[in-house]
Amino acid sequence: EFVPGYDANGNKVGYVTTVAQPGYAGDITFILGVTLDGKIAGVRVTNQAETPGLGAKVAGIEWQDHWIGKDSSYEFNKSVDAFAGATISPTAVYTGLIRALKAYETGVSK
């Protein structure tokens, strides 16, 4: 479910949804903000049990913020999007992001 988001003046600026995607050690749950034109406005991991120092890096603010501005056409780039020794967790987040963005395109933005 996508919930609309508004600025201080009451103008709709995008949508937010919660995504759960299987990772290495269970579901990785995150909140995704999407702009009206279908780009990522923000990502925040809210729950994960990935390996500390490896997959758990998906909860890092800098890594989460690197998704801002990307859309459903973005292709996973292992050298940019993954961590040494951990590809399952970042790939899971990417998969969840793309799945949610495509759902936005087919359901909300129409």
Regions found by a protein language model. Give the residues of each.
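Flexible, solvent-exposed loop/hinge segments and secondary-structure transition points
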Residues: 1-110
